[in-house]
C-alpha cells in the first residue's frame, strides 16, 4: 500500500486541477490513498473547496483524507469557518501555510484559534516549511512544544537539520517527503527516523516545476526514489498516514 500524504486539487498558478484529474493520476501511478487539500482555498473559494472534496470522496471513498486548509481570512470571516466545518466533509487534518499567508507569523491569537480547530476535530496539523525565514521548521518549535496533544507534520521538512532537531525533541512531529531532496530523506534514514517519515508528492504542483514530465511519471519517479533509499523498509514510509485516525464526523 502507498499513501500520498501531500496532494492538492483546485486552482493554482498554472490553471485548474480537477479532483478527477488528480485522482486518476494518483491511481494510475499505483497510489492507494491520498491526503488532499485544495489550493482553491488561497482564493478563499470556500464553496469550490467543498465541492472539490465531495467530488473526491464520491470518486475515491475512504481512500481520500480531506485536509482543511485554514487561512487568516477564513478564520476572521463570520460565515467561512462554520461553513467549512458544517459542510459534511469529514476533515482528517488541517493545514496552515505561513508562506502563503504571512499573517500567521505575527498573529499568535489567530494561530491559537487555528490549532483549536484541530483540537476540536481531533486531527493532525500540517505545517508548510520552506526556505523563507518565517517558514523554517525551527520557527514552529514553541507551537509544537506547547501543544503536545496535537500531531504535527512538517511538510517538506525544511531546513532538514531543524526538522530533525524538532523530531528528536518532540514525539508528536513527523515530516512528509513532498519536494524533499533525496539527500534530505537519506539524512532522516541515517538518523534512524524512518518511522517519522510520510510519503508525499505535492501533486499537481509538479506541473509548475517539471513541465516536461507528466504527473503519473513524476509520482512513479518519487516512489522509485523512496524505494531505492528505503530498501526493504520502504513500506514503513509508504504505508504511514497520520490522517487515517480521525474519528470525528462533521
Tell where the protein language model's regions lie, with residue ranges.
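Hydrophobic faces of well-ordered beta-strands that scaffold small-molecule active sites
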Residues: 3-7, 34-36, 66-68, 92-96, ...
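A general structural detector for well-ordered alpha-helical segments in enzyme core domains, enriched
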Residues: 21-26, 49-56, 80-87, 110-114, ...
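Divalent metal-dependent hydrolysis catalytic cores, especially in the metallo-beta-lactamase
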Residues: 5-8, 14, 21-44, 63-71, ...
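Short acidic/histidine-rich active-site segments
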Residues: 192-211
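Acidic-and-aromatic substrate-binding clefts and catalytic sites of carbohydrate-active enzymes
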Residues: 11-18, 40-48, 70-78, 101-107, ...
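Catalytic pocket-lining loop regions of alpha/beta-barrel enzymes
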Residues: 105-198
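Active-site gating/metal-coordination segments in enzymes
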Residues: 48-124, 171-173
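Mid-to-C-terminal alpha-helical segments outside catalytic/metal-binding sites
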Residues: 1-5, 16-34, 119, 194, ...
Amino acid at each position: 500500500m502507498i499513501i500520498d500524504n501531500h496532494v492538492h486539487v483546485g486552482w493554482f498558478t498554472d490553471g485548474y486541477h480537477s479532483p478527477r484529474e488528480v485522482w486518476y493520476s494518483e491511481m494510475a501511478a499505483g497510489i492507494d490513498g491520498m491526503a488532499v487539500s485544495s489550493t482553491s482555498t488561497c482564493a478563499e473559494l470556500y464553496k469550490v473547496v467543498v465541492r472539490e472534496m465531495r467530488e473526491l470522496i464520491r470518486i475515491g471513498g475512504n481512500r481520500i483524507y480531506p485536509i482543511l486548509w485554514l487561512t487568516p481570512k477564513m478564520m476572521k470571516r463570520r460565515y467561512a469557518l462554520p461553513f467549512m466545518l458544517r459542510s459534511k466533509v469529514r476533515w482528517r487534518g488541517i493545514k496552515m501555510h505561513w508562506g502563503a499567508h504571512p499573517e500567521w507569523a505575527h498573529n499568535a491569537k489567530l494561530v491559537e484559534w487555528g490549532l483549536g480547530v484541530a483540537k476540536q476535530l481531533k486531527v493532525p496539523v500540517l505545517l508548510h516549511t520552506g526556505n523563507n525565514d518565517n517558514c523554517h521548521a525551527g520557527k514552529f518549535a514553541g507551537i509544537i512544544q506547547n501543544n503536545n496533544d496535537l500531531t504535527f507534520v512538517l511538510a517538506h521538512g525544511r531546513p532538514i537539520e531543524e526538522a530533525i532537531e524538532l523530531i528528536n525533541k518532540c514525539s508528536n512531529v513527523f515530516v512528509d517527503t513532498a519536494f524533499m531532496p533525496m539527500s534530505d530523506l537519506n539524512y532522516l534514514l541515517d538518523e534512524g527516523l524512518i518511522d517519522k517519515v510520510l510519503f508525499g508528492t505535492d501533486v499537481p504542483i509538479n506541473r509548475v516545476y517539471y513541465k516536461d514530465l507528466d504527473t503519473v511519471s513524476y509520482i512513479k519517479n518519487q516512489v522509485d526514489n523512496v524505494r531505492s533509499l528505503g530498501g526493504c523498509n520502504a513500506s514503513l514510509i509508504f504505508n504511514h498516514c497520520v490522517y487515517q485516525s480521525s474519528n470525528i464526523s462533521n
